[in-house]
Amino acid sequence: MAKVNITRDLIRRQVKERGALSFERRYHVTDPFIRRLGLEAELQGHSGCVNCLEWNEKGDLLASGSDDQHTIVWDPLHHKKLLSMHTGHTANIFSVKFLPHAGDRILITGAADSKVHVHDLTVKETIHMFGDHTNRVKRIATAPMWPNTFWSAAEDGLIRQYDLRENSKHSEVLIDLTEYCGPMVEAKCLTVNPQDNNCLAVGASGPFVRLYDIRMIHNHRKSMRQSPSAGVHTFCDRQKPLPDGAAQYYVAGHLPVKLPDYNSRLRVLVATYVTFSPNGTELLVNMGGEQVYLFDLTYKQRPYTFLLPRKCHSVEVQNGKMSTNGVSNGVSNGLHLHSNGFRLPESKGCISPQVELPPYLERVKQQANEAFACQQWTQAIQLYSQAVQKAPHNAMLYGNRAAAYMKRKWDGDHYDALRDCLKAISLNPCHLKAHFRLARCLFELKYVAEALECLDDFKGKFPEQAHSSACDALGRDITAALFSKSDGEEKKAAGGGGGPVRLRSTSRKDSISEDEMVLRERSYDYQFRYCGHCNTTTDIKEANFFGSNAQYIVSGSDDGSFFIWEKETTNLVRVLQGDESIVNCLQPHPSYCFLATSGIDPVVRLWNPRPESEDLTGRVVEDMEGASQANQRRMNANPLEAMLLDMGYRITGLSSGGAGASDDEDSAEGQVQCRPS
């Protein structure tokens, strides 16, 4: 993170009045604050798990909802309970929200009884009760631009909209996910962009996160009602429930291809929380069963794949756009392999460009190389990431980080390695190791045919390596995989089964509409990935931006800790024990370095920077890498093993050693080593 000089900035704030706001934003959350973050207080009052937290706009009130069906409004700065009321729900409360511009008087709750209730806190009464959902209500969302309107997401697959100005006791369906994904889809979370209140993000079953334009949907519905044939349409027209352009999907590029493997191991992917950055340009997703992902909504990118020179001309045309640099903006996320299709540049006769690193970055690179040599893969990745942030045009750093990703083998590491290899080759077409690692990554990501073509291309570009033991070993692996794939397809054909389904969360082909397939194929890839936590046990686990400039990312975890990462480097910087079992909720204060957390324990915990004289060791997880490795193993354990781990049992093979402990990936690489340069 950038160094801070508070004395200098205090003087500037006194001299320049306009600097007051920037001062507040800059010092909202800083690296020294993060290092001193510790437990300030525990708020006691609930008798069950605390499933949701919500700050008011000023930050002087904190609302909580619990399994005990009560909501409590706290004065968090003085650690006082101001109000406690039974909400009228008959099951666990999963979401609580203050209605904007209502003087902190109106509170909305959603619960497992499928109900949404609206409460007047001044008289401690429930003034509206909505029972339109047919399954558990998981999230409520509000928008400052529409102070009388709010939305709910429930496990019946519906996103409903409520208008408190209307006398009706019913809501209207804004989005029906079952129209697109079939009757088994469940909506889990939603949020409204703080800078564009017409933009609604929805997380549901499967790896895809959906963005909708509320205004376009309303205009579409209005035009349908006014059309001469309106009488033959229902509110959600089954032929075209949403207008073209009203939805955009986002997905981590490797997940659609991984779905069959995850499904076979009963590993469920579901977005448990979505939130926008304060400036509305980024979307953060806590993907249940996987990692935390950040999507850039301004500079969108397609998932990365591979194109061979012989299949591409000097100028490619895809989707009407010309591409001459080898990177295309195709529309695919794993179904068709031509998105961000990277065409390897010709390398015959080229001279490898040497980019000198400044001395301090050279030292960081050497430290990373030493960590790699000691098999400290995560430490090496973090050091390379620090260097990459300062020297984003150095091919060697990307190539070295790719090698560390390939060795570590956590979920998503091979795809990040693929991205780094492609970046290294774009910066240095003669990067031999990056070319070879690219073929290995494609193979590990199940792009077997593409891996074979990439390996053949590597042999043509670097003939001196064509008969190395590394090439021979990878070639044998690819050939065996191709034969296995061919046999599997023949058996499926003989049995009347269809081909592999890469973009479906279920095996029922007819449950996915054609419109849904198109949206999935056009989905955008992530910018950053954050690893270390575990999100498999609960489906309400949150991840949030921390800081006015979204400098940090925080997430709860199944191991009872919460994790803090630097946003730009994705490096893990702090792990704190926040619950005896599971941390689900993390809600940062709107203007202070102040964090509220909750989970299975019936308390709300408040965290802020502690005095330097205070001992913080009690809740600090010192071995962050060990905790991260244990969580990766937990995520990959079968459901029975995960249940036993949650009950406190120790399981041989899961309690020690690294995630994916086998390390034969590069054991036979011969002359083409995976060690860093």
UniProtKB/Swiss-Prot annotation:
Modified residues (Phosphoserine): S352, S511
Residue ranges of the region described as Disordered: 489-509, 655-677
Keywords: Phosphoprotein, Repeat, TPR repeat, Ubl conjugation pathway, WD repeat
TPR repeats: 361-394, 396-431
Pathway annotation from the record: Protein modification; protein ubiquitination
Cross-referenced SUPFAM superfamilies: TPR-like, WD40 repeat-like
A molecular function GO annotation: enzyme inhibitor activity
tRNA-binding among keywords: no
UniProt key word Lyase: no
GO biological process, one term: in utero embryonic development
GO terms under cellular component: cytosol; nucleus
Renumbered ranges of WD repeats: 45-84, 88-129, 132-172, 182-222, 265-305, 535-575, 578-617
Function of the molecule: May function as a substrate receptor for CUL4-DDB1 E3 ubiquitin-protein ligase complex.
The protein, known as: WD and tetratricopeptide repeats protein 1
Organism of origin: Mus musculus
Gene name of this polypeptide: Wdtc1
